[in-house]
Amino acid sequence: MATKDLTFEQAMEKLEGIVSKLEEGDVPLEKAIEYYQEGMNLSKLCSEKLNHVQDKMVQIMNEQGELEPFDIQEDSSS
């Protein structure tokens, strides 16, 4: 499965595995660089997925079932 096809959870699981391997400290330099590059790609993917979800969360369905911006403002008259 290509990295871009991973779910957020799958990407995080792979990223956690890479971090664990690198923290062990007995990884050859070349392999550590490969892990680092893969980890950075996974980190970017997770960040993009979170940003996408955040964008969706700031919208709310109106009565016609259309998405509209969701604006949380406290009522100052209460």
UniProtKB/Swiss-Prot annotation:
InterPro entries: Exonuc_VII_S, Exonuc_VII_ssu_sf
Record EC number: 3.1.11.6
A GO molecular-function annotation: exodeoxyribonuclease VII activity
GO cellular component, one term: exodeoxyribonuclease VII complex
Catalytic activity line of the entry: Exonucleolytic cleavage in either 5'- to 3'- or 3'- to 5'-direction to yield nucleoside 5'-phosphates
The keyword Cytoplasm appears for this protein: yes
Enzyme class: hydrolase
Subcellular location field: Cytoplasm
Chief localisation class: cytoplasm
GO BP terms in the entry: DNA catabolic process
Keywords assigned: Cytoplasm, Exonuclease, Hydrolase, Nuclease
Xref: NCBIfam families: PRK14063.1 (NF010666), xseB (TIGR01280)
Subunit structure: Heterooligomer composed of large and small subunits.
Job description of the protein: Bidirectionally degrades single-stranded DNA into large acid-insoluble oligonucleotides, which are then degraded further into small acid-soluble oligonucleotides.
Family, similarity comment: Belongs to the XseB family.
Protein name: Exodeoxyribonuclease 7 small subunit
